[in-house]
Amino acid sequence: MAINAQEISALIKKQIENFQPNFDVTETGIVTYIGDGIARARGLDNAMSGELLEFENGAYGMAQNLESNDVGIIILGDFSAIREGDVVKRTGKIMEVPVGEALIGRVVNPLGQPVDGLGDIETTGFRPVETPAPGVMQRKSVSEPLQTGLKAIDALVPIGRGQRELIIGDRQTGKTSVAIDAILNQKGQDMICIYVAIGQKESTVRTQVETLRRYGALDYTIVVTASASQPSPLLFIAPYAGVAMAEEFMYQGKHVLIVYDDLSKQAVAYRELSLLLRRPPGREAYPGDVFYLHSRLLERSAKVSDDLGGGSITALPFIETQAGDISAYIATNVISITDGQIFLQENLFNSGIRPAIDAGSSVSRVGGSAQIKAMKKVAGTLRLDLASYRELEAFTQFGSDLDAATQAKLNRGRRTVEILKQPLHKPLPVEKQVVILYALTHGFLDDVPVDDILAFEEALYDYFDVHYDNLFETIRTTKDLPEEADLDAAIKAFKDQSNFK
């Protein structure tokens, strides 16, 4: 068989022309330091800020400090298997978390991995943990109410869908209870809730999850947890992971309530990371960008325009104070970012007034426009009445004689305080709140002994459920008060047949 040189030449040329280079070019570096959730690597000259980096053992990190000689990396997850001299490579991606309906009812870590032992989560979508907040023209003003089921909040400091309302107070003043009750009250309200537990004890998170499950709230709730035993990078990233999951629903036109419990611990974790990365410390040793840490998170909560689906994210961030000091650094930062704050006071809590909301220091800057008409009418003067009662109460401790008008104000004030108390995990529908506040502001409780107020309230609801459910239905459907004569007659009929004279 003769060898044809021309055929061989043509074959080689054809193969050269069809050659597809199949190289996997990645930039790699060498780990020079590892410890406390932080790594430093040399050789990643083109790494981008916030880029996801992969270590040779499969662990991931995020580039935070881009310095002339090396890159400071925060490690997402366990860092015990990483050693100096290990290879770390760029991925060209930023950190993303799984999002979607499959997460609802599950407990996940900030990376979106399940930690509830109920198997894998089949999600198809991913969202970056850091995304720009909606711009001014992409937003709508807050106009729809978010009912928490707590009389003291819905009447005095109303919250609207798309609002950011800070819950601030010392430890053990009932901050988490307020948020859990708000989540329980969203049952049947077409809301998705996300509870982000940052730096909590695992036993505490387990208790909250069981509470949500017991009341059927886990059916519409995602729990994201970065417990106190986990490395600081996970505590730092947890709120951003939570809001990324929320944004997926918001841009589908759905409404989301997200609770950050609490941002004080996230700030402490970020301070720890910043100091380990050798960033210059500022006030209280926090880095200079700690304000931006929280502002870029909370600005992602919004009521978006109809062009973007008209969805919303309502945020309830928590801040823990020391001895009621709301003028501390992180507290004042978050107060200035949010649309109002609910201040919980330890002395009110200890004296049995729960939820322990200080009406004088609490404010809702945009929620008033979202309040339903009925609530506006019955609760309009409630805050001022409560403030003047507190002032008079302090004054009367000096034992001076009181005129009839002052005595009447004190009597009404005592009953107001009693009405605003509420048992744990028993949120009230708005129509019931309106009826009892109407009874209070129109003097129907003035002759009821203070000790009987809560019993009166329960009996009134039961009586209305049986005999005057049409009045509840009117408030539910029209969002306005029924005819005052009808309400007056109904409450009077209840009082006439009851023992509360």
From Swiss-Prot:
It is a peripheral membrane protein. Its EC number is 7.1.2.2. Keywords: ATP synthesis, ATP-binding, Cell membrane, CF(1), Hydrogen ion transport, Ion transport, Membrane, Nucleotide-binding, Translocase, Transport. The keyword Cell membrane applies. The keyword Ion transport applies. It is found in: Cell membrane. CDD domains: ATP-synt_F1_alpha_C (cd18113), ATP-synt_F1_alpha_N (cd18116), F1-ATPase_alpha_CD (cd01132). One of its GO terms (molecular function) is ATP binding. One of its GO terms (cellular component) is proton-transporting ATP synthase complex. The record marks S362 as: Required for activity. Pfam families: ATP-synt_ab, ATP-synt_ab_C, ATP-synt_ab_N. It catalyses: ATP + H2O + 4 H(+)(in) = ADP + phosphate + 5 H(+)(out). Its main location: membrane. Transmembrane segments: none annotated. ATP binds at G169, D170, R171, Q172, T173, G174, K175, T176. InterPro entries: ATP_synth_asu-like_sf, ATP_synth_asu_C, ATP_synth_asu_C_sf, ATP_synth_F1_a_nt-bd_dom, ATP_synth_F1_asu, ATPase_F1/V1/A1_a/bsu_N, ATPase_F1/V1/A1_a/bsu_N_sf, ATPase_F1/V1/A1_a/bsu_nucl-bd. HAMAP family: ATP_synth_alpha_bact. Produces ATP from ADP in the presence of a proton gradient across the membrane. The alpha chain is a regulatory subunit. F-type ATPases have 2 components, CF(1) - the catalytic core - and CF(0) - the membrane proton channel. CF(1) has five subunits: alpha(3), beta(3), gamma(1), delta(1), epsilon(1). CF(0) has three main subunits: a(1), b(2) and c(9-12). The alpha and beta chains form an alternating ring which encloses part of the gamma chain. CF(1) is attached to CF(0) by a central stalk formed by the gamma and epsilon chains, while a peripheral stalk is formed by the delta and b chains. PANTHER family: ATP SYNTHASE SUBUNIT ALPHA, MITOCHONDRIAL. Belongs to the ATPase alpha/beta chains family. This is ATP synthase subunit alpha. It comes from Streptococcus pyogenes serotype M5 (strain Manfredo).
